Amino acid sequence: VGGRGALGPWWVLFRAGNSTVGVFGVFLGAMLALGGLPEGDFALISVLQALSVWSFMCSWNALNDYLDLEIDRVNRPDRPLPSGAISEASAKRGIALMMTLSVVSIAGAAATASGTVGGIEGWYPSLAIWLGALFLLTNYESAAPFSLRLKERGLPGNIAISLSVGMVVLFGAAGVFEPFNHRAWTVFVIGVLYTLAREIVKDVEDMEGDEGRSTYAMQVGPQRARTLAWALLLLTLASMLLPFAIGIFPELHLVGVIPALVVLMLAKPKLVLSEDHAAQQLIKKSMYLCLAALLGSSLLA
């Protein structure tokens, strides 16, 4: 399960390494909005919000594994829960602990914001975004009667995941009192499209183990799912280029996103050849290259 001693299974259950992407997302949003690193109270708010996102994502990842235990006995028997490395009772406590840490961190950010010039009112959009992410989480994972049960609805579930990923950037921008910053919203749109395409391809990749689940790929078949994923990637490409055309980012900085465009285009032949794992990995690499380029452009502008 991992080479990190007693913490190894927990590291895997929480996907703690992958969850650090949320930390990057918060600071990305803040730096896009400010054109540089946050300082003073803004720096403290950003750190607390980054911790809140990290622990929120850890909790979400563990909850997903907990609810998918039977599926993972087929798909991923080496995961901490199906392998027995972590008990179900311990996992529930870990999920609650991480969500508590997220709540405490967001409360700390609120307390810090209340002492700034903008006051708590200027910070409220951050709270709205956090609550929005919590709404998506509960309605994605929960099978309760009042839940939207997004996980069981195929594409709406993929959209919920994608929105929650993109919202991290807006969360970071809102933390520095810039919730409507154009650069942050541009990256939000790009991130949502990238993630949605990748989630669909990952569903195709997992079709064998997802038998009985109503994923989009299971509903329409692998070829139609791959076609939609590619259409979304073309929209992603357009959303990467448009901000340079309308002045949100300087035209001269367009060269910075060329590597991301090239890697994105490499995903097409992989989809045609049904090499779904390779395709979704290329999509992820392209997204990271794009985010790095847009951050660099924002800092240099």
Sequence positions of predicted segments:
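Intramembrane alpha-helical segments
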Residues: 3-12, 20, 83, 89-180
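Extended hydrophobic alpha-helices typical of membrane-associated regions
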Residues: 3-8, 25, 145-154, 224, ...
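Membrane-embedded alpha-helical segments that form the functional core of polytopic membrane enzymes
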Residues: 23-67, 102-107, 123-138, 180-201
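Solvent-exposed interhelical
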Residues: 52-103, 192-240
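Functional transmembrane core segments of multi-pass inner-membrane proteins
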Residues: 33-48, 159-207, 223-240
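Transmembrane helix-loop junctions in multipass membrane proteins, especially transporters and channels
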Residues: 34-38, 69-70, 110-118, 142-146, ...
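Hydrophobic, membrane-facing alpha-helical anchors
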Residues: 2-3, 70-74, 132-145, 183-186, ...
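Lipid-exposed faces of alpha-helical membrane segments in multi-pass integral membrane proteins
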Residues: 20, 24, 28, 51, ...
